[in-house]
Amino acid sequence: MKKVILVVIDGLGLRSEIHGNAFQMANTPFFDKLFSEYPNTLIQASGEYVGLPDGQIGNSEVGHLNIGAGRVVYTGLSLINKALKDDKFKENQVFLNAFNKVKENNSTLHLMGLLSPGGVHSLEAHLFEILKQAHNSGVENVAVHVFGDGRDVAPKSIRESLEKLQELVDKYGYKIATISGRFYSMDRDKMFDRTEKAYKAILGKSGNEFSSALEYLDLQYSQNITDEFLEPAKNSTLDSRYFLKDNDAVIFFNFRPDRARQLSHLILNSSLYDYQPSHLVKVSDFVSMMKYEGIKCNIAYEEMLVNNPIGKVFEDANKTQLRVAETQKYAHVTYFMDGGVDVEYKNSKRIMVDSLKVESYADTPQMSAEEITSQVISHAKDFDLTILNYANPDMVGHTGVLESTLVALEVLDKQLSRLVKWAEKNKITVFITADHGNAEVMLDENNKPVTKHTSSPVMLVTSDKSLKLKPGKLANIAPTVLDYMGMAKPKEMNENSLLDK
């Protein structure tokens, strides 16, 4: 059976423009040879191709997850957006249970979260859809508790969102019960005096009041208070039904956990913090949009389970596998490559090469690439599949130092040349790809350093000159390797091989 080495270069995309492109500027004769003499193709590594929102830059975690899974893995916001796009909110049993609880108890459903199109902690479209589904399910009493953003979006930008929300609640006979800036409702620094102010408004115990949400916004703006710092206030036109009390149900529609946990703790009196809530309520149901670590509640959208990633396929087929990376990227070739699970397969070996302990990798752009190559050359003959990661383009690219990134790529060029020559001599086939872009964009149009990832496509190159490769995305790589090795792919791997037969 053929043996394969899969090389994942971290943070190296492809683009034709030379300006600020360390990959085009570096002296890389072996890469030049790979692209001119070996089969190669383009692989998409960002946005919807890897289960992220459209246009979003790729990252190492998502990249390795998709490579190992053999299918597009939807995570976080994109997981919920896909459910929204596919009109699946109405089938979400966790939402339906919350709706049913308030109908049975003749109580109120409280929807709370960041009213924002920002997509960092929440997305207002999710709230609007939950309102629609609550109405369609016959929920009579719904109170919305609005948190102002002004941080992931412009400081004074909530008016349009608030107008949309007001129109919807009027249509369904629901109410905007409270308003507070995220400074209060979404503190994450254990400043519970802030969180308490938002909590008291939700309980109907705030001294600040408004009769119209939009008028209250104007009043706050007139005092130079922006969305983030809107003072917690309650709607004075509402009766006690619309403020949080026993037997009510809560849906917290923030999907990101870090700034949702303190307020959740106050409502649930959880064991996550030592702080004791000023008022205790016993809600019938508490739903978080995604998992809030340390908060016990019902979760509307769980992260996707990746069954049968490439490592499991090799294990089940009684094949051997080797994983090699330096400390900085070790979790990526193990935990993320294995579907977000920490598992050591019985026919496997893992080698972690120590990353250099330095303040900045700009000072040591070679990183541990030579040692990684040496370890692979020492061990790969004994394994059916070797997966390794070279961290240089990403970690040095993040420093924003162009000269160091050029050195990093030249070091990598030499190490790849060493590895491929050895593999060819030992009749082992190499596939080379990358998890996302970075080093190919080091300067912006104003010649300022760029340190972030990119949405550039990446390479897939193979040392087997008899092959032809089709273009694809990261999720096609595992099926391609299995196809090449004559192994069946599991049903979960719904992406195709890129071998052009």
Swiss-Prot record:
Q: Which residues bind Mn(2+) 2?
A: D10, S60, D435, H436
Q: What is its EC number?
A: 5.4.2.12
Q: Tell me which residues bind substrate.
A: H121, R151, D152, R182, R188, R256, P257, D258, R259, K329
Gene Ontology CC entries for this record: cytosol
Q: Please name the GO terms that the record assigns under molecular function.
A: manganese ion binding; phosphoglycerate mutase activity
The similarity comment for this entry is: Belongs to the BPG-independent phosphoglycerate mutase family.
Q: What is this protein called?
A: 2,3-bisphosphoglycerate-independent phosphoglycerate mutase
Q: In which pathway does it act?
A: Carbohydrate degradation; glycolysis; pyruvate from D-glyceraldehyde 3-phosphate: step 3/5
For binding Mn(2+) 1, which residues are annotated in this chain's numbering?
A: D394, H398, H453
Give the required cofactors. Mn(2+)
Assembly and interactions?
Monomer.
Its EC top class is: isomerase
One Gene Ontology biological process: glycolytic process
Per UniProt, the cofactor note for this protein states:
Binds 2 manganese ions per subunit.
Q: What does this protein do?
A: Catalyzes the interconversion of 2-phosphoglycerate and 3-phosphoglycerate.
Kindly indicate whether the keyword Lipid biosynthesis belongs to this entry: no
Q: Which reaction does it catalyse?
A: (2R)-2-phosphoglycerate = (2R)-3-phosphoglycerate
Give the source lineage, highest ranks first: Bacteria, Bacillati, Mycoplasmatota, Mycoplasmoidales, Metamycoplasmataceae
The record's active-site residues are S60
Source organism superkingdom: Bacteria
Keywords, in A-Z order: Glycolysis, Isomerase, Manganese, Metal-binding
Record NCBIfam families: pgm_bpd_ind
